[in-house]
A protein has these predicted regions:
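Small-residue-rich transmembrane alpha-helical segments that form helix-helix packing/gating elements
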Residues: 1-34, 39-172
Length: 172
């Protein structure tokens, strides 16, 4: 194997790993702020993707407009779930909260399937499928964008957990 192929695979693998680290960062951020693992986090992410799809394809807005609108929508969905389902369980045994988040996961998946069906749907996110040429290396553009997003989220995570101001904000 020549060095350029090895470098290309190593960089694409590292960028792919950053995508997984975003998922882990979300799990850690929720656990650290609430001391409860949220078993419905994957279903909430899936619902957010379907909301983006509904806004982009249903209303016809561009993807970069649909994403912030879906984020706002999901903020209010999450706040509603917290107020209606999770807040009532504050101070209760952890198993009750885990069971509630598991039930929310099942409910969100079933509701999403009832609305949009069970087949996967293609969605263009506005990133070209053409590889990014970095000298002799070919990089996947979506991985590069993911790496930029991961770096931004790691900076936010660092701010909230390693700076005095972030720790004060978390305490509020």
């Amino acid at each position: 194997m020549d060095f350029s192929l090895f470098s290309e695979l190593a960089i694409n693998g590292a960028l792919s790993g950053l995508m997984y680290s975003l998922v882990a960062l979300g799990i850690v951020l929720i656990y650290k702020s609430s001391s409860v693992p949220n078993l419905a986090q994957g279903a909430m992410t899936m619902l957010g993707a379907y909301v983006v799809l509904a806004i982009a394809n249903g209303i016809g807005l561009p993807m970069w407009t649909a994403i912030p609108l879906a984020m706002g929508t999901m903020f209010f969905v999450g706040m509603g779930i917290e107020r209606v389902a999770l807040r009532r369980l504050a101070g209760r045994p952890i198993i009750m909260i885990l069971m509630m988040t598991l039930g929310l996961d099942i409910f969100i998946r079933a509701t999403t399937m009832a609305i949009w069906g069970s087949s996967s749907r293609p969605m263009s996110i506005g990133i070209s499928d053409e590889p990014l040429f970095l000298g002799p290396l070919l990089l996947n553009r979506s991985y590069v964008v993911g790496a930029v997003v991961a770096a931004a989220l790691f900076a936010i995570f660092f701010f909230f957990f390693r700076t005095r101001r972030g720790i004060v904000l978390r305490a509020i």
